[in-house]
Structure formats: C-alpha cells, structure tokens
Amino acid sequence: MSSAEMEQLLQAKTLAMHNNPTEMLPKVLETTASMYHNGNLSKLKLPLAKFFTQLVLDVVSMDSPIANTERPFIAAQYLPLLLAMAQSTADVLVYKNIVLIMCASYPLVLDLVAKTSNQEMFDQLCMLKKFVLSHWRTAYPLRATVDDETDVEQWLAQIDQNIGVKLATIKFISEVVLSQTKSPSGNEINSSTIPDNHPVLNKPALESEAKRLLDMLLNYLIEEQYMVSSVFIGIINSLSFVIKRRPQTTIRILSGLLRFNVDAKFPLEGKSDLNYKLSKRFVERAYKNFVQFGLKNQIITKSLSSGSGSSIYSKLTKISQTLHVIGEETKSKGILNFDPSKGNSKKTLSRQDKLKYISLWKRQLSALLSTLGVSTKTPTPVSAPATGSSTENMLDQLKILQKYTLNKASHQGNTFFNNSPKPISNTYSSVYSLMNSSNSNQDVTQLPNDILIKLSTEAILQMDSTKLITGLSIVASRYTDLMNTYINSVPSSSSSKRKSDDDDDGNDNEEVGNDGPTANSKKIKMETEPLAEEPEEPEDDDRMQKMLQEEESAQEISGDANKSTSAIKEIAPPFEPDSLTQDEKLKYLSKLTKKLFELSGRQDTTRAKSSSSSSILLDDDDSSSWLHVLIRLVTRGIEAQEASDLIREELLGFFIQDFEQRVSLIIEWLNEEWFFQTSLHQDPSNYKKWSLRVLESLGPFLENKHRRFFIRLMSELPSLQSDHLEALKPICLDPARSSLGFQTLKFLIMFRPPVQDTVRDLLHQLKQEDEGLHKQCDSLLDRLK
C-alpha cells in the first residue's frame, strides 16, 4: 500500500512538471502535506518527508517552473511544516533538503515580509533560521547534542561528521548575510529595500545579525584547531561570493583571512598522515584561488578604503605567490613522495587542550544563540496547520486577488473596461471600479491595512503616469456627478423638513397650553419655569445643583411609572475578565517597553528646558526620563526574573542601536544592577551577565573612532573581572582595531590598579597567540613592573 501511494505521488509530480506546473505543483504539495499529517500513514512519514522536501526545493529554486511571483508565497506557506520536520527527523537527506530550501527561499520570504508586514510569517522564518544555525557545528540529525564537556570522544566525533549538511548551512549563512546587508546595485534582495520605520523588520538589528554571522564564519577559520578541510574550503568559497556582491565587507573578510593560519591546524583524530597532507594542500589551493579571484576582479587593490589597505594587499599577494610555489614544488615531487615512518610533524592535542577546545566550542555556540535571540533549549515542535492557518488564509486571498488582477490586465490592455463618468450606484466600489461594470466580489476588507497600503503604493509606483491620470479623472468625474445629484435633491427635502418641524412645534405649544397631566408636559414645565423666574445668571455650582435635582425628579417620575407596569429587572453581575497567561503578560510587557523607547526617542521642541538642574527623575521636559524610570524598575521593581530579563533584552537592543549617544544610559543601567545586588550583600550576578552581554554586543561595531566612548565605558564600569577584559582580546587581535584595544588596556593600567594583574595575564596570552603583537604587549608590560 505504501509503495502504491508513493508511486501515485511520483506520477502526479511528473504529470504536473510537464502540464501546467504553476497550478498543479502546489496541489501536489498540499496533498503530500495532508498525507504527512495523516495519523494512519505513520509508516510513510520518512518517504513522504523526503518526497515533500525535494519537491519544495524544486519549486523554490532558481530554475523552478513556477513563476517568480508565486515562489515566495509557496515557501512561506510551508515554513511551519518544514520546522516540524527539521525538529523531528533523524534522516540526513530530509534535513539537508530543508537547509537547502532555506538557502533558496530565505531572501524571497524576507522580501515578502518587507512588502506585507506579516509578523507571523517573519516569526516562523526566524524560528526555522535559528534552529538551523544552532546545529551548524554539530552532527545533527545523526547525533544528539552532547552536554557533558568531559565526553571528549563524543564531541570530537562531530567535527568531520555530516559534512554535507554543514556545507549547506554555510551556504545558508552566506545567503542570510547577503540578504541582510546593503547592496550597491538594486537588482537583488537586500536590506536597502527595507524602510527604516518598518513595523515588523528592525533594519539595524538585521544588519547587526548579518555582521555577526559573517564574523562567525571568519572566527571559525581562525579558531578551529583541527584540519576540517571540507568546511574550510566551503567557507572560503562562500566568502568569495560575499566579497564580490557586498564590497563593504572587503576589509573585514581580508583581515580575518590574514589571520587564518593553515599550518597551525592539527590533524583529525584517527586520520592518516596522507589524509592530513592532502587536506592541507586542498585548503592552501582554495586560499590561493580566493586571492587570485580578488586580484583578478579588482577586489583586492592597493587603494582599499582602510588605512591598512596597502599592507593587506602586499601580504595577500605574497601569500598567494608562496602558495603557488609550494604547489609547484609538491606537483614536481609528488604528494605521495614522503616517508610514512617519519610520521606527521604536527602533534595531536593533549586532553587538557581538548577540554579547552570543547569549552571554546560551547562558548561560541552560546554566543551564536545569544546573537539569534534564542535560549539553549530546543524549541518546542509546532503544529503546522494550527500555526499557519491565518497565514494560509491571507495567502489564499492574495493569490485570488493576484489571479483576478492578472486576468483583467491581460484583457483590457491600455484602456479601462469601465470608463463611464457616472457611477452605477453611490457606493465606493462603483466609484472606483475601472475593471468591471458590476461588483468584482473581491473582499479586500479581510486583508490587513498595512498590506492594502503596500499593494496600493506598489501599483501606483509601477503604473504609467498617463494611465494613472486617466483613471483618477474618471473617478473624479464620478464624485462630481454624485455631489451634483445630492445638491439638487437637498432643497426640497430641507423645506419639507422645516414644514414638518413647524407642525411639531405647534402641537407642542398646544400641549403646554392645555396643561395636560402627562409626563412630557411636566418635564417641559420643569425645564422652562427656572428660565422664566431667573432675573440674573446664577453661579455655576447652583446651576449644576438644579440640573441634578431636575434629573433626579424626572427619574423618580419615570421610575414610578415603570414600577406599576413591569417588574424590577435584576442587575447583571459585574464583568470579570480572564486572567492573562504568562506568554500574554510578557507580550504586553514587551509592547509597553517599546512604547517607552519610542517616547524617549521623540524630541520635544515645544518647550525649552530649564537651565537649572532638577532632581526629579521623571521630568516632563526631558523625553528620555522614562528610561531612567525603566532602568530603576528593571533593577529593583520587578520580582519575576523572566519579566525583568525581557526588559533587559529590550534595553540592550535599544542601547546598541545608538551606543555612542546612549553611553551614559548604559553606564547608569550597569551601575544600578551592581549597586542593588551588592547593597543586599548578594553576588552581582545580573551585573556580570548583562555587562558581558553589552561588551559582546558592542564588539562587532567598535572601530578606532570609538576610542573615547569605549574607554569611558570600561573606566566607569563598577567592577571589572577577567571575563570583562576577555572581551578586549578579539579587538586587540584584529589588525584594523588593535590600537583601540591597547589604548583601553593602557588606560586601565594607569587609572584602575586593581585590574593590573588581570591585564598582565591578558597581555601574556596575546603575546603567545600573535607574534606580531610582541612590541605593543611589551610596552604595556613594562608599565606594570
């Protein structure tokens, strides 16, 4: 039975590929997805997953028979199902196909989110992206994640396993970097197409994430201690695409590549000497090809924008020439021409070094998860139909609207089908309809307003100006016709209304004159008598008192009448709202925090600030005073750790967006964290955690021009430990930013004596890791003597 059903799916796929694939292939995908969720076909889970992922990959790839306008919708529709498969599968092919699908569809879905402002779609895309990136250095799905650092063999076994998935993940990382950075040309999807004030996409956060992912690839080349040749070559090849399409990354990539020492890599456990020599030769060849590619395409030039550009050019040119000579010598001698008895000159790592390597591995994984904003726990599997129901409905409506529009556009050509200057009725649809003489049955009220605005603006921008003016003229003439029709009908209706009003007034006067004992006559008499008796204008309080008395008496009269005719109605019980769940509380807390950030960012120019300093924390004249309250609240006022950490995450993201202008707030926040816990005689764990997070987040953005800012931050932190100074290590090792790191260390030596021992240890580590830093390290060590 299973083979028969799979055979039917294969036949349906073949038939759809050759006959109207635009309409047939999505139906095959829907059928496969429904079969995958069918509990009676549990034995077919793996074959269906393989078939489904391969078909989605064929649909969203560049050479797909599906139109480019349809591919983003199809990719977005099945994001929840792909995430569920990735979390539950143990098959390498299925997981690899999912990663390749992300490579092809991530730019498309990101562009769709930018155009539709769909928060739910973006959340699903981020969940799948985070899951894939969190497993890129593991052997998932072949092995479960290893938590015990002392299990050396289990950790090291993951290094060269599942290479195909790792290479696919590297390709996906490069696609994320390309999609989330600016492009000099407008022919591809990039962050330049995202508005600065987009309601869903945070443009600075996306660009920051792209920089960190690029640094992650470069750091792998530098810090990986084993010769994983396939991964090294994959990263170098991916960097060639990034540096070609994003010239602004040239300095960053070339600086990292200069620190990539092929000779310093150790052979993998259990691999032969010949395997190590071949692996090393392949990596050197890829390195040389990268440099030659950069020179040939005028990427690596003497006129690079950095001051150290000429040195980078000369160093890379020399490395390329040296590698070429080594390759020629190896070719002439023969790579197999060596004495196996002498063994490999490279020694293996000791157990202690292996434990350090695994510890570094775990720290890098934690930093990656922190960058992506996820916890170290595995995400809970999601149910595809429940999560994507609203998204699928909206996508279906957009597809119907798109099909209807394309059909009308193909028939009408350059003229409007309905160009009558008079509308059929006084409805908006008849005024604006230029494609039908009757209702089009397109209910766009089901779509969100932001999507409607985006569709309208895109249509106006792409329309010919002459045709747009013609259409607007037709609509204007219809409005004019409706207005003239209304004006002509107003006089007769208003005169008849006046006549009826006069008749009503006469009847009312008769009732008052007859003194009839009705409720209306009593009420009118009560309202008119005070006006006749008052010789002068009473005070406001007296007038209000009289009005209240009159209202009470009127209510008593009407109440007595109602009691005689009907029973007293029972009072409805008070409304008791449902209590919020924990997730809802955190959601509203996050929204409230963002509103405070918007308020603090708003510049108040209506009132000038007073020159005298005020001791009030919440000052109406200071738009940023809410931040001081928020800092005090998060450090002292919220007992729930989860809620306070959520606000801290928002604070960190807000400060990093403009860290130069907000350095005072950063220092205030961290000092409050330290002071509150130390005043209670507690270990300042919150201060340590979030001060390290601040330094890790600032690392990718710091440049030499930020010297004053960074020295001030480091000098005003209330407590500095070895972990804080460890954040200076990558800055000191970076050739483009080393002066920033050493100037900061010099300042700490001079003005913060308690950290001198820690600085001394850091300088010794820098001397061991980079011989080119000996001179700078020795000059600072001399100050410590």
Swiss-Prot record:
UniProt-annotated location(s): Nucleus
GO process annotations (BP): mRNA processing; termination of RNA polymerase II transcription, poly(A)-coupled; tRNA processing
Described function: Essential in pre-tRNA processing. Component of the cleavage and polyadenylation factor (CPF) complex, which plays a key role in polyadenylation-dependent pre-mRNA 3'-end formation and cooperates with cleavage factors including the CFIA complex and NAB4/CFIB. Component of the APT complex, which may be involved in polyadenylation-independent transcript 3'-end formation.
Quaternary structure note: Component of the cleavage and polyadenylation factor (CPF) complex, which is composed of PTI1, SYC1, SSU72, GLC7, MPE1, REF2, PFS2, PTA1, YSH1/BRR5, SWD2, CFT2/YDH1, YTH1, CFT1/YHH1, FIP1 and PAP1. Component of the APT complex, which is a subcomplex of CPF, and is composed of PTI1, SYC1, SSU72, GLC7, REF2, PTA1 and SWD2.
Protein name: Pre-tRNA-processing protein PTA1
Region (Disordered): 487-544
Residues carrying Phosphoserine: S500
Gene Ontology annotations for the cellular component aspect, listed alphabetically: mRNA cleavage and polyadenylation specificity factor complex; nucleus
Biased composition (Acidic residues): 502-513, 530-542
Pfam families: SYMPK_PTA1_N
Alphabetically ordered keywords of this record: mRNA processing, Nucleus, Phosphoprotein, tRNA processing
Stored InterPro entries: ARM-like, Symplekin/Pta1, Symplekin/Pta1_N
Cystine connections: none
Other known facts: Present with 3730 molecules/cell in log phase SD medium.
